[in-house]
Structure formats: C-alpha cells, structure tokens
A protein has these predicted regions:
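Long, ordered, helix-rich scaffold segments
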Residues: 1-185
Length: 185
C-alpha cells in the first residue's frame, strides 16, 4: 500500500502543472487511466470480508485515479452506483462516496441533480457526508450553477458561516469557478 500510495501522491502532484483543457491534461489522464485500470479490475468498487487492509486503503485512491483518467467503465460503474443509491446516498461506502457523487456531477450534470444534492447538503447532519457533498458540488463546471452556489454563500440556512471557508477553497481549486469565487469577494 505504501508504495502505491506514494506513486499516486506523486502523480497527483503533476496536476498542479496542468491547466484544464490543455493537451497535457489528456496525457496525464491517459497516464492515470493506464496506471489504475488493472488495479481497479482487481479491487472492484466494493469491499468484502477477504480484503486485506492494503486493499481497503487503496480502493478509494484507485477509483479516484480511474475516474480522473476518464476510464469509461469506471465512469459508468460510478454512475450506476449513484443511481442505485440515489435516494440514500449517505449509505454509499464513505471512502468512495465523494468520488461517486463528483463523477455524477462531472459526467451527468443536470440542474435537477445539482439542486437535489445541495438540498441534501442542507438537510443532512452527517459531517463526513457533508464533506463529500461539498467536494462534489464545488467541482461543477456549469457557470450558472457555480454562480448559484456562490449565491448560497450568504445563505446561512445552506452554508453555515463556519463552513464557508471550505466551500470557497473548493471553488478556488476549480479552474472553472475560481474567478467567480474571487469576484464574490
């Protein structure tokens, strides 16, 4: 696990040098796809009783890498899991829940799903689920939905003042949203 984890940490550092939409991004995504494909096939999406501790720890890293690499099989599997758990997303495995929800917003985005997830964030009391939802919601690329999300910054019923920093930071990290976030200030 340690070697694999360091490998993916190093590969993830390369994202800092890539701009969205550039040719280099496609090369990096292809690298992630190749790097994760066999491991994802071996590990699968859900754990079982025979999993070693290393397999349990590696699964979320491998799934995130496969999704970043635009592995079409992984994208469809994440979508299928989202659809299966749609009415009870909190029951998705906590270690992969954020990646599954983020995948849905990145590849199957609709305003309806966005608003459902934002409302789920508003009503849930599970802090780890809130973190997963925030991470996914701040990764959206649609300008209108980004502006709607920023409009919620001042609505304490949705985003509590103590949580605002995490939302702002998430949008700053999103190349499609960081200018909107700066403009809000």
């Amino acid at each position: 696990y340690i070697v694999t984890d360091v490998l993916y940490q190093t590969a993830n550092k390369l994202k800092q040098f890539i701009q969205a939409g550039q040719a280099e991004e496609k090369y990096l995504q292809d690298f992630f796809k190749v790097l994760s494909q066999d491991q994802l096939e071996q590990l699968g999406w859900t754990g079982n009783q025979q999993d070693t501790n290393d397999q349990i720890l590696m699964r979320p890293t491998i799934i995130s890498a496969a999704l970043y690499g635009h592995n079409q099989v992984a994208i469809r599997q994440a979508h299928d899991l989202f659809a299966e758990y749609h009415d009870h997303l909190v029951d998705l495995p906590a270690d992969t829940r954020g990646a599954i929800i983020k995948n849905e917003l990145q590849h199957y985005l609709s305003a309806e799903v966005f608003h459902e997830l934002l409302n789920t964030y508003r009503t849930t009391t599970d802090p780890s689920f809130k973190v997963a939802l925030r991470g996914a919601l701040t990764s959206i690329t649609d300008a209108d939905l980004i502006q709607h999300l920023i409009g919620e910054f001042e609505n304490a019923e949705t985003i509590k003042p103590q949580d605002l920093r995490g939302w702002f930071q998430g949008l700053l990290a999103n190349e499609f949203a960081h200018q909107y976030a700066w403009d809000w200030i």
